[in-house]
Amino acid sequence: APKVIVVGAGPAGLFCAQRLLEHGVRPVVLERGKRVEERAEDVKRFSETGVLDPSTNIQFGEGGAGAFSDGKLNTQTNSPLNRDVLETFVRFGAPQEVGYLGKPHVGSDNLKKVVANMREYILSQGGEFRFSTALTDLKIQDGKLRSFTAGGQEEGCDALVLAVGHSARDTFE
């Protein structure tokens, strides 16, 4: 099977990893921040002390920037994939009504549980997560990706999906 790297453990990265598993690919998910449970502690510390950890905070870490939002799910597209996304949220612990309400609301407490459940499922199917591991370089040769560097280590890969959030602009620099 090909070695596929997914960069980012927000919604796009988690759904990508799950879809890869459905096609027999065991993804390696790189995330610059921490697991959602650890992020909650960091966010609480920030709100109490004002001390910001630049790599794991309300913007960075498993679950993405929305992990600490109110959990409202809005879309302005009328895609048939919307139902699949909502059913996936329910399968991993969101309230049943998320699957049929016009304006679904997972809730911030439920959202953290859903994210953790998605991670555990991906791990149980042979996926891998590397937290506190930022992508720092890509090696492209003859127009083809040859390797990536993350956590100070260079590794080969067959494909890499950038599923970084809006705050990870430095990844593109």
Predicted stretch roles:
Residues 1-173:
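Residues forming the flavin
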